């Protein structure tokens, strides 16, 4: 995406001014601004400290992670599989007066398989729509990791927005869910076998904390 036109969006969420650059044709940044302002992830309802750890699976160009870092000052570990999004995330960190070292960022796809490769379909006009369930002319190849090794003492908030990948991830960490206090998740449905209600019930029956979720199609 080296030749595409970029645009910078500026908005204030929770009293914090944020700036994010993305490709001009993508609606992802204004869409996520709307999610943050509507508090889909419950960030205005909780308190986190600098000692807390937030895991961001499906970080895109960094909106959630950067807002969390600026709002709470806690440790943020973010995972974004699409290289162009990953590079834009780094630029957005600097644009928001943070250091690259302020957020631990991994160019990797979190799945149920360690050290594999996956192909991700990339819509050219929507940086937030990349998914392994899309097969397009433009594909990104990325290594995979499992999330369990990152779930350590101090992990407080798990955010998952990975375009259908949640169905592979959640069952692998049921025994570690209660290390978190909060889970923020967006459910997707790309295949007929993917059941957002069943996945939510699985989470709800194995997790004692608070789940903030966005239903598929909303």
Please tell me what each predicted stretch does.
Residues 1-218:
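Phosphate/nucleotide-binding beta-alpha loop and adjacent structural elements of enzyme active sites
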């Amino acid at each position: 995406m080296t030749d595409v036109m970029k645009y910078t969006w500026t908005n204030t969420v929770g009293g914090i001014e944020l700036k994010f650059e993305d490709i001009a044709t993508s609606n992802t940044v204004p869409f996520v601004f709307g999610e943050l302002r509507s508090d889909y992830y419950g960030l205005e309802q909780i308190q986190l400290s600098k000692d807390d750890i937030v895991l961001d699976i499906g970080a895109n160009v960094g909106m959630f992670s950067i807002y969390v870092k600026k709002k709470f000052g806690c440790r943020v570990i973010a995972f974004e599989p699409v290289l162009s999004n990953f590079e834009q995330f780094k630029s957005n960190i600097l644009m928001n007066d943070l250091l690259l070292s302020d957020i631990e960022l991994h160019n990797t796809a979190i799945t149920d398989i360690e050290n594999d490769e996956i192909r991700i379909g990339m819509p050219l006009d929507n940086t937030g729509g990349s998914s392994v369930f899309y097969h397009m002319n433009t594909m990104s190849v990325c290594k995979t990791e499992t999330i369990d090794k990152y779930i350590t003492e101090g992990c407080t908030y798990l955010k998952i927005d990975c375009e259908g990948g949640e169905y592979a991830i959640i069952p692998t960490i049921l025994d570690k869910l209660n290390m978190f206090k909060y889970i923020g998740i967006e459910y997707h449905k790309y295949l007929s076998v993917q059941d957002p209600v069943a996945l939510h019930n699985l989470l709800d029956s194995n997790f004692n904390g608070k789940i903030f979720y966005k239903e598929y199609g909303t």
